[in-house]
Regions:
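Extracellular carbohydrate-recognition regions
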Residues: 23-44, 83, 232-239
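Extracellular glycan-recognition surfaces and repeat-rich motifs
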Residues: 34-60, 67
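Secretory/extracellular carbohydrate-interaction modules
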Residues: 63-133
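Short, aromatic/His-centered strand-loop micro-motif at the edge of beta-sheets
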Residues: 137-162
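Short tryptophan-centered beta-strand motifs in secreted/extracellular beta-sheet-rich domains
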Residues: 159-168, 173-177
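Flexible glycan-contacting loops in extracellular carbohydrate-active proteins
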Residues: 186-219
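Extended polysaccharide-engagement surfaces of secreted carbohydrate-active enzymes
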Residues: 506-956
Length: 956
């Protein structure tokens, strides 16, 4: 009997223990709003008691676009089983290959790390039709589940589906869909818990569609949760992938050996200057001409110390690699200041003790050869990860490290000097193997493409480190020859006019590429700086500056509303090479004006090296007041170089420019398609213009736009049925512009250009940017239009005239746009308005040959997602054709415009005002890209004809 009682007691105890270990099951029926009491809810989230599934019970939880619903189960990451039904509607964004996510569902840890499935989009996923599992932190801006994911390959079948996340305390996480393991009959063929960072479950996660199209609504029904005990199983991640860096490079290089110029072999310093030039640099540094740079440098070096956190990454890697490290090193060269020498050595030892130059932050190591050797072995053994040691931060760090090692070469301890030389060489190898040869998983956006700032930036550090640390030895030949091939590829696809399709803000990347070219020319005898691009880049920089040189004539991704000059001091060197005294004077003037600005005050080492004080006598006021940039289809005019001058820019060209686009047919993909070209920073702005006067922007443009994306509604152009310009196969409004699948060179094209002294006429055709398109988000659609011809006429001291000829085969709504910081009506009946900013203002008048419905709205223009709140005239017409004529009055001449049509293909435009009675007779172009015929006249003034014969635009 005692044995029986003892047995019963033992069984009872076991049952109690088992019951306590087993979770209490919780069910949520979503019958009323109290069902989510205690949840963390944001955005479009609601309980719908009437929404259910066939054979289901209770209502459903609705999570609309942007909504979030988190149910925190506790503070610990435990085992447990989570089951629910979701309704899959199959909807997807227009561009499912852009990194984004639609509706998501899953589980999360106590520290906010979520594991989710649902509609996950990326170039390497099929998120529009299949599922993946992704991990991210929903609270961390920029983090996305596509960045760490496992592909399930399961179809997104429309309908209700049961999802189970079973976190077993002994075995880890299993995922089931409709009660079937996502791994099917082959374990771990798709999902492997050990590849995740999810040790247990604390929270249940439901998130709404976050794509631009925001078309998906998530419905959740029948939620059941059973929390279990603490996890016994621990994540056992697979071993890291093997390092991508081979022990040795290939023995033989393709092509001729890279030989160092005799005067440079085994000589230091040799990067950017030699020992023979140091006396000249010192003289300039101590001269009145060098005073600003000297004061900048002396004021800056005090803060040049190794950071306490030992991170290389502040300011995108620029703070140390491009600013502080080279600044203090050059200060030592020029002054022999012992403190600056010690700071420079400390920088080198910091980097010698750091394997990861992308982030840094590694603990300090002993100052011994053995410790540095271990760091070197760590570097060589690093496996693929993101863009570690192959991103811009790593490259910028290589720039500063290479220059400092080279400039201080003769004063460094010989043993440490050799250790650091090896570090530079190995970092160059890692940059090339990890970046250019795809050893790291990320970086596809810049690999293989020409004319892109990210590639130029990487080539900067790669070249200085490889050529600076190398000597042309047999074992170095392969990498040196690869570097030369890389530079040649960049050289081959530079536009001749010195322009950059990414906008004037990216002049720093051209300066970086120029330094790489210059080092190659100096050390190995190439002639890359002989490229027409570098003959013209200084002029381009000046011409894309506003007349006061405190800001740029903005296009593409430029800082909206901010002041700044888009010049790299390296262009002083190229201007000196080509004896461009006026350009040099302009750059010098701008660097003085912006002396205290970020990116200038911290770059004083550059103008000290690159200026040539022997070139004198120039004046920027002698620079041309009208210029045409054929690669981008840009016309720039100004009435002088005075600060309050009137200036205008007209743009009609393909995204990426003609030169980069000409590369695509030469590198077709296996199936015959055109390859990817990075146009991420280009804007949909064909046939747009800006106007400045009285030292202010009057007709404004977009900034460095992010949300709500790159839109034609942010610039001075037109919309068709409310939709702007798109590339073939791409949606409107991407944050990072993507190339069309077909030829982009006909999206925008200059059809005529004529400079006639005080009169400049430029004409562009942009119908190719208004292809047939349906927007998944707004449900708007439009047919392709036949013509969007805009003529932009500059009459110096008088007015600016814009004339549009717009045609479609089907009736459409045409919306004509013009925006400024402030816009107010003067006489709406006459179409007269006033643009204003600060103390500057000018009036304009708009006429058309069809009835207009005009209103003043707010532009979508933004700068880093902050709306600029430009006020925008939106003048709409309906039909198959419309002609608009707009006269802008920046010289305050009180001019007026009249438009008199003569059938569909002819019109007369008159511009009148005190002392002005001009007539412009227009006859439409015959062919797609033929020039229209214009005859303009002013009594006792000009009498000009512009047509296909007299106004052929300069070739790109």
């Amino acid at each position: 009997m005692k044995k029986l009682l003892r047995s019963v007691a033992l069984v009872s105890a076991a049952l109690v223990i088992a019951a306590s270990a087993r979770a209490e099951e919780k069910k949520v029926a979503f019958d009323n709003k109290d069902a989510i009491a205690g949840w963390t809810v944001t955005g479009d989230v609601a309980v719908d008691p009437a929404k259910t599934r066939p054979d289901g019970a209770g209502g459903s939880l609705k999570i609309g676009p942007g909504g979030k619903a988190f149910w925190k189960l506790g503070d610990a990451d435990l085992s447990g089983k989570v089951e629910f039904w979701v309704y899959e509607d199959g909807k997807a964004p227009a561009d499912p290959k852009a990194h984004a996510y639609g509706s998501l569902w899953g589980v999360m840890t106590a520290d906010g790390h979520a594991l989710v499935s649902g509609a996950i989009y990326a170039p390497y996923l099929g998120g529009d039709t299949t599922y993946a599992v992704g991990e991210f932190n929903p609270a961390k801006g920029g983090d996305l589940p596509s960045l760490k994911c496992q592909y399930l390959g399961l179809d997104r079948a429309v309908g209700w589906h049961k999802w189970t996340f079973n976190m077993d305390a002994d075995a880890g996480l299993t995922i089931l869909v409709d009660d079937k393991d996502v791994n099917g009959t082959t374990p771990k063929s798709r999902f492997d818990w050990n590849k995740t960072d999810l040790p247990g479950i604390s929270t249940i996660v439901f998130m709404g569609d976050a794509t631009k199209d925001a078309a998906q609504t998530l419905w959740v029904n029948g939620l059941t949760v059973a929390q279990g005990p603490a996890m016994k199983a621990k994540l056992a991640p697979p071993p890291p992938p093997p390092p991508f860096l081979p022990e040795k490079d290939p023995a033989a290089a393709e092509g001729p050996a890279v030989k160092y110029v005799a005067a440079m072999a085994n000589q230091h310093p040799r990067l950017l200057f030699t020992a023979e030039r140091i006396p000249q640099l010192k003289a300039f540094y101590n001269s009145p001409q060098g005073k600003t740079y000297r004061e900048q440098m002396e004021g800056y070096v005090a803060g040049c110390t190794v950071p306490e956190d030992r991170k290389t990454s502040p300011a995108w890697g620029q703070e140390y690699g491009l600013f502080k490290i080279p600044m203090v090193a050059l200060h030592y060269v020029l002054t022999k200041d012992h403190a600056s020498f010690e700071k420079s050595v400390a920088y080198l030892k910091w980097l010698a003790g750091t394997a990861d130059w992308t982030e840094g932050g590694e603990p300090a190591v002993a100052d011994t050869p053995e410790a540095y050797a271990k760091v070197m072995e760590k570097l060589k053994g690093l496996g693929p990860y993101d863009e570690r040691n192959s991103d811009t931060t790593a490259s910028f760090t290589m720039v500063g490290a290479s220059l400092t090692w080279d400039w201080l070469y003769n004063d460094l301890d010989p043993a440490f000097r050799e250790e650091f030389r090896q570090a530079l060489w190995e970092h160059a190898r890692v940059m090339y193997y990890g970046g250019h040869k795809s050893g790291n998983p990320e970086g596809g956006y810049w690999r293989g493409v020409p004319a892109y700032n990210h590639r130029w930036f990487r080539d900067w550090g790669l070249t200085l480190a490889a050529l600076g640390a190398g000597e042309g030895k047999p074992e170095e030949q392969w990498l040196l020859s690869e570097v030369e091939k890389e530079l040649r590829f960049m050289w081959d696809w530079l536009p001749s006019d010195g322009s950059q399709h990414e906008g004037p803000s990216y002049g720093s990347s051209a300066g970086g590429l120029g330094m790489a070219f210059g080092v190659s020319d100096d050390l190995s005898g190439t002639h890359y700086l002989d490229a027409p691009f570098f003959r013209n880049v200084g002029t381009y920089t000046m011409e894309t500056s506003a007349s006061g040189m405190t800001e740029t004539l903005r296009f593409a991704d430029s800082a909206g509303g901010g002041k700044g000059f888009g010049c790299n001091p390296f262009f002083l060197k190229t201007a000196a090479m080509y004896k461009q005294a006026d350009v040099m004077d302009g750059i010098r003037h701008a660097l003085q004006l912006d002396a205290g600005k970020w990116g200038t005050v911290d770059s004083a080492w550059e103008p000290i090296i690159f200026d040539d004080p022997s070139i004198k006598g120039g004046h920027y006021a002698n620079l041309p007041t009208s210029v045409f940039l054929p690669d981008l289809g840009i016309s720039i005019t100004r009435d002088s170089w005075q600060e309050k001058a009137v200036a205008a820019m007209f743009k009609c060209g393909p995204m990426g420019g003609y030169k980069a686009n000409s590369w695509r047919p030469t590198h077709k993909e296996a199936g015959g398609g055109l390859p990817y070209l990075n146009v991420a920073h280009d804007h949909p702005d064909a046939n747009s213009f800006i106007i400045l006067g009285d030292a202010e922007y009057l007709a404004e443009t977009d900034g460095y736009c992010e949300e709500p994306g790159k839109l034609s509604s942010s610039v001075n152009t037109i919309l068709i049925n409310g939709l702007g310009q798109v590339a073939d196969g791409r949606p409107e409004g991407d944050v990072w512009q993507q190339p069309g699948g077909g030829d982009m060179t006909e999206m925008g094209k200059i059809t005529a250009y004529k400079e006639l002294g005080d009169v400049v006429v430029v004409e562009g055709e942009a119908a190719g940017s208004y292809i047939a398109y349906s927007d998944a988000k707004t449900k708007r659609s439009r047919p392709a239009i036949d013509r969007f011809r805009r003529t932009f006429i500059w009459v110096k001291g008088g007015y600016i005239l814009a004339f549009d000829d717009i045609r479609s085969t089907k009736p459409v709504e045409i919306t004509w746009l013009l925006q400024g910081a402030k816009l107010e009506p003067v006489n709406e009946a006459e179409g007269r308005y006033r643009l204003a900013k600060g103390d500057a203002q000018c009036e304009f008048q708009l006429a058309a040959d069809v009835p207009l419905k005009s209103k003043i709205g707010v532009s979508t223009a933004n700068d880093h997602s902050k709306l600029l709140n430009w006020q925008q005239l939106q003048a709409s017409a309906e039909g198959t054709a419309a002609r608009y004529a707009c006269v802008v009055d920046p010289w305050h001449k009180n001019v007026k415009v009249t438009l008199t049509p003569d059938g569909p293909d002819k019109a007369t435009i008159t511009v009148s005002g005190p002392g002005i009675a001009d007539t412009w007779r227009w006859e439409a172009a015959k062919g797609k890209f033929d020039a229209a015929t214009w005859h303009g006249s002013r009594r006792r003034g000009f009498d000009i004809t512009v047509d296909a014969k007299t106004a052929v635009p300069p070739a790109p």
